[in-house]
From Swiss-Prot:
Belongs to the bacterial ribosomal protein bS16 family. Residues 84-110 have a biased composition (Basic and acidic residues). Residues 84-120 are annotated as: Disordered. GO terms for cellular component: cytoplasm; small ribosomal subunit. It comes from the Bacteria. Disulfide bonds: none annotated. This is Small ribosomal subunit protein bS16. Residues 111-120 have a biased composition (Low complexity). Keywords: Ribonucleoprotein, Ribosomal protein. It comes from Rhizobium rhizogenes (strain K84 / ATCC BAA-868). GO terms for molecular function: structural constituent of ribosome. Pfam families: Ribosomal_S16 (PF00886). Signal peptide: none annotated.
């Protein structure tokens, strides 16, 4: 049984509230779960202490038993110091794409041609 530490949505329409739960990966998002280990209220201010509440001991227990946290839950665990999140680094993403580089080269060529024409 593949276990996940994930968010289950609660609350009402346009007023989200999430429970941090231990659930089988095959069960529905808001469906059956084994244990509730925390909560996240995104409606509260980011610096509010009650925005994210976690039961660190139970989460460590489930992590030791093979439960895998989802990306968002892993962020919460990293902030709480329960688990370490690897920093994603993609330096290639900041570079312009092939078409953008071609357009920049054409623009530079036109500027150089215009400068040469005015110099003559």
């Amino acid at each position: 049984m593949a276990l996940k530490i994930r968010l289950a949505r609660g609350g009402s329409k346009k007023r989200p509230y999430y429970h941090v739960v231990i659930a089988d990966a095959r069960s529905p998002r808001d469906g059956r779960f084994l244990e509730k280990v925390g909560s996240w209220n995104p409606m509260l201010a980011k610096d509010d202490a009650k925005r994210v509440e976690l039961d660190a001991d139970r989460i460590k227990h489930w992590l030791d038993n093979g439960a895998q946290p989802t990306d968002r839950v892993l962020r919460f665990l990293d902030e709480a110091g329960v688990a370490k999140r690897e920093v994603k680094s993609n330096p290639e993403k900041a570079k312009p794409g092939k078409r953008a580089q071609e357009r920049a080269a054409e623009k530079a060529q036109k500027a150089a041609d215009a400068a040469a024409a005015t110099a003559e």
